[in-house]
């Protein structure tokens, strides 16, 4: 068997600070919801968000230890306040080839509407555990039994 690689962390990037990565400025955003410690990188110059597991085409897991729908909603509101209609969300978990999975502002708007309707009880999900809520044609939100 091959030895496991060791990845050393030299520095933790502080939240809400800009990091220069080879002449490109990225702001580190705390993005709880999927997990308590989720983060997103924001490139204001290119109007891009690197969202990781916070939002992507496919099933969003919001039933993990540390997942929180209130946090998901609040982070989604903050992201919508930050970006414009031209912004691109570069996400994780490519389900369709080729290229990086991309979403747009309207996908965050759809997620926010879904979260609000789950909270108010007007959006009905399918299943018991996880409960699946249709966000749009590309995204489902999977939650535990209660908000």
Give the predicted meaning of each segment.
Residues 77-147:
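Accessory terminal helices/loops
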Residues 4-81:
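Catalytic core of the metallo-beta-lactamase
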């Amino acid at each position: 068997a091959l030895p496991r690689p060791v990845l050393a962390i030299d520095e933790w990037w502080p939240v809400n600070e800009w990091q220069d990565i080879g002449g490109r400025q990225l702001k580190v955003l705390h993005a709880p919801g999927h997990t308590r410690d989720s983060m997103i990188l924001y490139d204001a110059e290119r109007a891009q968000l690197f969202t990781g597991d916070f939002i992507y085409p496919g099933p969003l897991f919001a039933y993990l230890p540390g997942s929180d729908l209130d946090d998901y909603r609040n982070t989604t509101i903050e992201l919508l306040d930050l970006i414009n209609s031209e912004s691109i969300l570069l996400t994780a978990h490519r389900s369709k080839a080729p290229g990086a999975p991309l979403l747009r502002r309207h996908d965050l708007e759809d997620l926010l509407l879904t979260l609000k309707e789950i909270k108010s009880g007007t959006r009905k999900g399918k299943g018991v555990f996880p409960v699946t809520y249709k966000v749009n044609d590309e995204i489902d939100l999977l939650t535990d039994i209660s908000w």
